[in-house]
């Protein structure tokens, strides 16, 4: 038997009536204390620049996906202006890798986070024509050694634009909560049968 680490995937389903235009998304893993481990997916348009043309408006990405951007600053030491943030502390020992957490038999666990934000979706509370309602954070605790292969990501908070602070008064958000139909984390057994062992 050829032992391989477990593999992580994230099936997602959107509510079709509420996904035009397509929202911006970031997916990352973090420790149970809130330190980012690794960015697993980031909307390509937001990957390399701080100011982006977000469906016709020039917007800072820390206003689009503020929670992800704040977590990234904390481990990279680079703030949203591109400058080194001396208050974030040293990051030289950060591995930026999820692999060490995907080890069976060691009671490993981590949190998968998905931040999603749709442009131009203002409501009575959030009236900015550019930003509209804030980004929403969905999370799931993943325990590597559990027999449960799927975890549902639950709506947890929304992001404070520019600051990345978590806000929990989700009753102030309206249609943005209907963007996502289902988000799952799937942890697959990475072990594969060694064909030579059956000969």
Predicted ranges, named:
Residues 23-25, 110:
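Short beta-strand/loop motifs in extracellular/secreted proteins, especially
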Residues 5-22, 45-47, 122:
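Short amphipathic, basic-aromatic surface patches that mediate peripheral association
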Residues 15-16, 39-49, 155-166:
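Short, solvent-exposed aromatic-acidic interface loops
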Residues 32-122:
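Structured domain cores in non-transmembrane regions
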Residues 5-9, 93, 111, 137-139:
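Intrinsic-disorder/low-complexity, polar/charged segments enriched in Ser/Thr/Lys/Arg/Asp/Glu/Gln
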Residues 26-30:
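Beta-strand signatures of extracellular beta-sandwich domains
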Residues 100-199:
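Glycine-rich, aromatic-bearing surface loops/beta-hairpins
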């Amino acid at each position: 038997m050829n032992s391989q680490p477990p593999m992580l995937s994230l099936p997602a389903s959107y509510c079709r009536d509420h996904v035009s235009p397509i929202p911006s998304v970031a997916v990352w893993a973090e420790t149970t204390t809130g330190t980012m481990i690794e960015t697993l997916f980031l909307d390509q348009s937001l990957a390399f620049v701080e100011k982006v043309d977000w469906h016709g408006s020039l917007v800072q990405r820390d206003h689009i996906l503020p929670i992800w951007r704040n977590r990234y600053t904390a481990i990279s030491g680079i703030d949203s202006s591109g400058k080194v943030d001396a208050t974030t502390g040293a990051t030289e020992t950060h591995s930026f890798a999820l692999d060490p957490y995907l080890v069976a038999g060691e009671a490993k666990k981590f949190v998968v986070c998905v931040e999603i934000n749709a442009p131009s979706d203002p409501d009575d509370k959030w009236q900015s024509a550019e930003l509209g309602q804030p980004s929403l954070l969905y999370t799931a605790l993943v325990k590597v050694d559990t027999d449960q292969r799927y975890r549902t990501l639950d709506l947890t908070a929304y992001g404070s634009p520019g600051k990345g602070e978590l806000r929990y008064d989700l009753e102030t958000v309206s249609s943005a909560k209907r963007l996502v139909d289902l988000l799952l984390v799937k942890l697959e057994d990475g072990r594969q049968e060694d064909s030579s062992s059956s000969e």
